[in-house]
Amino acid sequence: MEESFLESFGRLSLRQQQPPPPRPPAPPPLRGTPPRRHSFRKHLYLLRGLPGSGKTTLARQLQHDFPRALIFSTDDFFFREDGAYEFNPDFLEEAHEWNQKRARKAMRNGISPIIIDNTNLHAWEMKPYAVMVFQTEQKNLFRLEMDMVVFRPEMKKHSWSPKRENTPNERTV
């Protein structure tokens, strides 16, 4: 599953994508070979990055690649019934608690993978989800730093960053 997840990064693009070519059927197992065991490990992905860095785009790509995946975003709290987004900072704490309850319920129900699509800029935003991993049957926690994954050329003229050395986990896009 981890390899497929990493492949999702490679398919991210701002351009319209062509459908992938069909995969050839798997060859039948050799006689006497035990059947391949499927991984039943549960996964929680914490997407982390500034607004506009591509977290929601990646979350949707992952959900496309893994149809059983559920996305939980605190932003959903601020959508009105008519579909309009209306952020109110006075309700931010309540919105985070609401999202955590939804994620906890999904974990307890054995849903996997679970994708947390929040900015998660502060440790207090991520900590409840990390704690849930140890309180439930989730086995793997992945924190993805979006500022190292998504390059958006149209945003380049509005951004500035200091010169820095490449870090071992950084992916140049």
From Swiss-Prot:
Residues 18-32 have a biased composition (Pro residues). Coiled coil: none annotated. It comes from the Eukaryota. Keywords: Developmental protein. Residues 1-35 are annotated as: Disordered. Induction: Up-regulated by USF1. Up-regulated by FOXO1. Pfam families: AAA_33. Interacts with dynactin subunit proteins, including DCTN4, DCTN5 and DCTN5. Might play a role in adipocyte differentiation and triglyceride accumulation. This is NEDD4-binding protein 2-like 1. The gene is N4BP2L1.
